């Protein structure tokens, strides 16, 4: 054989079989960075139509997790595929840099502001900490192969962004959406200040647990709801609470709309009265009240009780029944005492019903002087007085001491309270923001489409947005309010622009360093500076204006797409919608796409305690970023995204199939010159024309899938093409022609031309997903080309030509089916040691007339399609009884081992082996390919 080896066209490539991605990818990243790849891409799309994907900023604290990776990789796939589609798609990554988590980290190192460090020093430390966190996360994102302007990201703590946040707020104010109100916050009476969620610890505490009766104002209206006409005794609704001191601030009774309530008559100490209680709880309540007997009078849904009124147990006013989602029937009575000034749920539901936010308690935890009955008492001491008063009024149904978990101050270790304090709000209704926002939601495309109804419901039901915080590290609310009237300065908008100009130069510290007289002159004594900072959701929610509208890369274009996890309907999508509508009267985005959360193989949330966390760093170090990227692309992100080592190993297997296909393509177009060796599609062998046609059709499908962000469809169709049309059919068939045909014959060049066209197309198809591998392939493709595939557009060389004399796609589909049946028979014969390989087989196909016509079209070339040395087509009626049946009703088969000699060069068993005396071990076909003009192939 050694004499003839040099006459074969053996495959050869530098593209290694093993990806070795974990080691090779970092070298590529270095090269991309040194060559300014991102800038090259920007340059290549200079005047193209823009596509703007705006990056929702992750929080600058801690390492990135798998959810961050999913998010950034999805964005990167979109940016790259849009670039391939000819768009100018800049990607400016961002980070959210202000807020409590960073403050807490810095406090652990330097203590609280105002103690060992000044507030100014503390802010500087926060800035330094956030910058360091950004650096760490940036490296991890770059490692994923995400293309972005990494050296010029946006940070919400950039001086320019901080200034623009102030400008954004001034526009919201100018449009009339700001108002001052009150909101309950955690309050430590020892500190005399509000506490953030993170400053609250839960400890066990003994508290009075009481059941209190509120008597009906209009008994007949209540009875009518239960279908009753008359009742002689008192009727009350009963609440259960462990904070009797909040009863002076009670302004409503909350029930659950979809819970059933029972009117139950109770006799106790000879007294009869009827009580409204949740059906699921009334028996335990009656027992707790010590009833001697009871009778059920009727039942009704909670929703039917809405807006009925009941008397306050010790003040001279009545309160309504309201519906609240927070009401449960786990314990108590199923009716919740509602004091909007003393509870977050109470406040939210109270906003919906326009309830007064009563706050009778001062900073020090003592009732204010105008509090009826309890003025001057500390709230915790007043519990006893409230209980005694209820007993005196006959409103106390039960009273016990219970031990329960209660919020405490982390500094003083003392119980805290919820207390309404003055805050700044963006109003949902005073200028029609709610209505406008809902209208904008309808103009936006939501992917998946259930996102629309989800955010619509949230906007319909949300309270005013409290945008103020009492923190140190945040963008200040740069307002001056009148010391006596609390009114905003009439020139607030222009004053805010002057403050913004200073912040642009010096950062947010400029506000705290500012003396009011510098801007207000003689008026300074009448006004005070607001010391509150903005909710960090305002920082990120305003970036459509503070970043996208401000940065030159975006050329002032509208944003096409926001893409984040499904929790952001409540978060970034919401805050962005509110601010943009308040500022500009429109949504900031045209499309909003959400992806699900990552869960482990059993559908559980990732958790260190469970030990099921998969870190992106672990995956890139072990398998490589392209494997992680392939997993992201192949997973349907519209639901939960399941990840585990086993699932990632499956992605690695899928990757190997794609890599092996690419390797075969490269190895067989080695030395091919696309200028001089290319065979026109109309001159190709029919099978080659078919595969080019299939590739062209596939490209259309892939481009549509990319355009609709259906990346799992892209990977599915690509895998199908690599495994079935190419792997199991086309590539298998052409090996003989590719290796044994005359080197520059039409038979071989036709095949190479098809492989070249597929390679040019496929490297582009995979580039948005398998970026590292695409770059590796690109550098080994023959012909002149640009430095990077990423500056290219989708391949236009694929033509879908069907000649009149051609075999249709349906024809080849039939052949695929026949070949699959023949393969089964050959495999079986190999297993039973009847033959060694398929070329030892001679196959007879017993086919009906229709199928015979199909098979006979190929003449002697049918054997190349079936990978056998000899193939014969015979009428189905002539099939012997021992012929092998197939899944095709029109086909039976028989197989025998060839008795012909094996050609030393092509390994086919042919009767003409040795008939050319100069080449006694070769078949005539091989002699023609070595010494003659080369064999002619028409079909395969």
Curated annotation (Swiss-Prot):
L-isoleucyl-5'-AMP binds at residue 564. It is found in: Cytoplasm. InterPro entries: aa-tRNA-synth_I_CS, aa-tRNA-synth_Ia, Anticodon_Ile_BEm, Ile-tRNA-ligase, Ile-tRNA-ligase_type1, Ile-tRNA_ligase, M/V/L/I-tRNA-synth_anticd-bd, Rossmann-like_a/b/a_fold. Zn(2+) binds at residues 903, 906, 923, 926. It comes from the Bacteria. ATP binds at residue 608. Its cofactor is Zn(2+). GO terms for biological process: isoleucyl-tRNA aminoacylation. CDD domains: Anticodon_Ia_Ile_BEm (cd07960), IleRS_core (cd00818). Monomer. Catalyzes the attachment of isoleucine to tRNA(Ile). As IleRS can inadvertently accommodate and process structurally similar amino acids such as valine, to avoid such errors it has two additional distinct tRNA(Ile)-dependent editing activities. One activity is designated as 'pretransfer' editing and involves the hydrolysis of activated Val-AMP. The other activity is designated 'posttransfer' editing and involves deacylation of mischarged Val-tRNA(Ile). This is Isoleucine--tRNA ligase. It comes from Shewanella halifaxensis (strain HAW-EB4).
């Amino acid at each position: 054989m050694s004499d003839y080896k040099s006459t074969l066209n053996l495959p050869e490539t530098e593209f290694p079989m093993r990806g070795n991605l974990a080691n090779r990818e970092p070298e590529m990243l270095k090269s991309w960075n040194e060559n300014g790849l991102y800038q090259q891409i920007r340059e290549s799309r200079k005047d193209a139509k823009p596509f703007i994907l705006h990056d929702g900023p992750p929080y600058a604290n801690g390492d990135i997790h798998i959810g961050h990776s999913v998010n950034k990789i999805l964005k990167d796939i979109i940016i790259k595929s849009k670039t391939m589609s000819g768009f100018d798609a800049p990607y400016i990554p961002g980070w959210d840099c202000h807020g409590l988590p960073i403050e807490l980290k810095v406090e652990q190192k330097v203590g609280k502001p105002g103690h060992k460090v000044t507030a100014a020093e503390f802010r500087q430390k926060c800035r330094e900490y956030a910058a360091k966190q950004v650096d760490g996360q940036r490296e991890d994102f770059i490692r994923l192969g995400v293309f972005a302007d990494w050296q010029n990201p946006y940070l919400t703590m950039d001086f320019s962004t901080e200034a623009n946040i102030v400008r954004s707020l001034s526009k919201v104010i100018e449009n009339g959406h700001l108002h001052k109100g009150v909101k309950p916050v955690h309050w430590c009476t020892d500190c005399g200040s509000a506490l953030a969620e993170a400053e609250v610890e839960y400890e066990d505490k003994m508290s009075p647990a009481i059941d209190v009766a509120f008597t009906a104002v209009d008994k007949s209206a209540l009875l009518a709801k239960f279908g009753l006409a008359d009742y002689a005794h008192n009727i009350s609704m009963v609440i259960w609470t462990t904070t009797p001191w909040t009863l002076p601030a009670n302004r409503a009774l909350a029930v659950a709309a979809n819970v059933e309530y029972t009117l139950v008559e109770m006799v106790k100490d000879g007294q009869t009265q009827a009580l409204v209680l949740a059906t699921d709880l009334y028996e335990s309540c009656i027992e707790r009240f010590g009833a001697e007997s009871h009778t059920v009078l009727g039942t009704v849904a909670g929703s039917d009780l809405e807006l009925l009124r009941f008397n306050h147990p010790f003040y001279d006013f009545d309160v309504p029944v309201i519906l609240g989602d927070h009401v449960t029937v786990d314990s108590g009575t199923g009716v919740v005492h509602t004091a909007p000034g003393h509870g977050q749920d109470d406040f939210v539901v109270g906003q919906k019903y326009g309830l007064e936010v009563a706050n009778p308690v001062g900073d020090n935890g003592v009732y204010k002087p105008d509090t009826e009955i309890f003025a001057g008492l500390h709230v915790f001491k007043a519990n006893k007085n409230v209980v005694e008063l209820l007993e005196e009024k006959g409103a106390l149904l039960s009273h016990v001491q219970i031990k329960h978990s209660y919020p405490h101050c982390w500094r003083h270790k003392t119980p805290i309270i919820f207390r309404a304090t003055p805050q700044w709000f963006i109003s949902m209704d005073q200028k029609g923001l709610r209505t406008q926002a809902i209208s904008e939601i309808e103009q936006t495309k939501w992917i998946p489409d259930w996102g629309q109804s989800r955010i619509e419901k949230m906007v319909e039901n949300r309270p005013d947005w409290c945008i103020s915080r009492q923190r140190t590290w945040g963008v200040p609310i740069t307002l001056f309010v009148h010391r006596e009237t609390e009114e905003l300065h009439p020139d607030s908008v222009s004053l805010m622009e002057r403050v913004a100009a200073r912040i642009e130069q010096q950062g947010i510290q400029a506000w705290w360093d500012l003396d009011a007289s510098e801007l207000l002159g003689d008026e300074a004594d009448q006004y005070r500076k607001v010391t509150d900072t903005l909710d960090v959701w305002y920082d990120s929610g305003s970036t459509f204006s503070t970043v996208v509208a401000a940065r030159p890369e975006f050329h002032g274009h509208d944003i096409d797409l926001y893409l984040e996890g499904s929790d952001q309907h409540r978060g970034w999508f919401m805050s962005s919608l509110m601010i943009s509508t308040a500022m500009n009267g429109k949504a900031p985005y045209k499309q909003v796409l959400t992806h699900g959360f990552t869960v482990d193989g059993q559908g559980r949330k990732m958790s260190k305690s469970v030990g099921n966390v998969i870190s992106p760093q672990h995956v890139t170090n072990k398998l490589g970023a392209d494997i992680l990227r392939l997993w992201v692309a192949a997973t349907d992100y519209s639901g939960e995204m399941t990840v585990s080592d086993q699932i990632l190993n499956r992605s690695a297997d899928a990757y190997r199939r794609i890599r092996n296909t690419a390797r075969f393509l490269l190895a067989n177009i080695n030395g091919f010159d696309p200028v001089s060796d290319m065979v026109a599609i109309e001159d190709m062998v029919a099978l080659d024309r078919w595969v080019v046609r299939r590739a062209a059709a596939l490209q259309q499908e892939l481009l549509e899938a990319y355009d609709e962000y259906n990346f799992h469809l892209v990977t599915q169709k690509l895998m199908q093409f690599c495994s079935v049309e190419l792997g199991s059919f086309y590539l298998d068939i052409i090996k003989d022609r590719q290796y044994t045909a005359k080197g520059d014959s039409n038979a071989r060049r036709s095949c190479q031309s098809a492989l070249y066209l597929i390679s040019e197309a496929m490297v582009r198809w995979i580039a948005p997903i398998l970026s590292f591998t695409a770059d590796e392939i690109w550098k080994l493709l023959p012909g002149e080309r640009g430095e990077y595939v990423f500056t290219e557009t989708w391949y236009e060389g694929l033509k879908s030509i069907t000649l009149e004399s051609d075999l249709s796609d349906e024809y080849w589909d039939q052949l695929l089916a026949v070949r699959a049946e023949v393969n089964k028979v050959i495999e079986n014969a190999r297993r039973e040691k009847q033959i060694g390989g398929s070329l030892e087989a001679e196959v007879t196909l017993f086919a009906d007339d229709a199928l015979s016509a199909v098979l006979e079209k190929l003449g002697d070339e049918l054997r190349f399609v079936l990978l056998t040395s000899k193939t014969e087509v015979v009428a189905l009626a002539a099939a012997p009884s021992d012929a092998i049946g197939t899944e095709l009703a029109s086909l039976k088969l028989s197989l025998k081992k060839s008795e012909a000699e094996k050609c030393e060069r092509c390994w086919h068993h042919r009767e003409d082996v040795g008939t050319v005396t100069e080449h006694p071990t070769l078949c005539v076909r091989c002699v023609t390919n070595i010494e003659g003009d080369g064999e002619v192939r028409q079909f395969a």
